[in-house]
Every structure is written in C-alpha cells, then in structure tokens.
Amino acid sequence: MKSDQFHRLVGLIYEASADEACWPEVTKAWGHLFNDAVVALDYGATTEGAEVPLLSTHDFDVAARDLHFEEYRTPTDNPGIAALLKAPINAPVSIDSFLSQRDFDKDPSVLAILKPQGIDKGLLTTLKRDPVAFSFISIFRRRSQSDFDSQERHAQQILSRHLSK
C-alpha cells in the first residue's frame, strides 16, 4: 500500500463531500489502493431494506445487484446486510467472519451477485447507522487475488472514518 495513494484518497474523500461528481474518482482510487479491489459505496440505505441507493462503485456489476435487489435486500435474505447492521461503525468486517466458506458457496445472495463476478472475499464497513438508514462501503477481491491483510484492514478503518464524517 503506497502512502501517496492513501493520502490522495483522503483528499478525494473530502473533495467528494463538497462535489458529488467526485465519488466515482473516490471509489476508483479506493480500488487501486487495495490492489484493484472491487468497491461498492452505498449511502443512505434503509434499514428495512426497502431501498439501497448506490452512490458509487469501482469494477462492481451494478446490474447484477439491481437485478436481484428485491430478493436480497433484507438482513434475513442477505447475510452481508445482517453483518453490516450489527457491526460497529467504521470497523471492517471480513466476509469469512460471518460466513464459513461452505455457507458462502451455498448462499443464494452470494450465488446471484458476488460469485458471477468472481468475488470470494471482502471487507464490509458500516459508515453510519440510525433507526431508519445506514451507509456502508464494501471492498471485494476475486479468486485470483489475496485476502486482505492486517495493514489493509487498518487502512480501511482509517479511511472509513474520513468517509463517515
């Protein structure tokens, strides 16, 4: 992880908070910082799962998510949403901490949205949560990529704090 990329991303986060047109640049830089990770930033999702407005992505198949949105929009239907609603704010949660590999390979939401993209690992981070809405960022890696290491998890936590301001 390069220090200059990290500091550039922090600056981009604050630029995007003033100009929404910068969010695609933020998610692209986020993906590059984490060795070409797939990034999905959702802002203002309702806790009932009624709506999950996607703010910005990098290399994430939004069409697959939208196609299966109704089926996997609630914590009952999507273990990732359940984990995000329980996780501490700004604390990255690894997919393998709430789903065994066996369960991951069988989960309908994973099979519909993540597996077709070759995604098999990820860090999910809740940015904000209140009784009606929450925001989160997910960074994923594909089968051919390594898992997230402790330095990357720490960087994700620091960056998410900037993002949640």
PLM features: what roles do these ranges have?
Residues 4-151, 155-162:
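Regulatory input/activation interfaces that engage signals or partners
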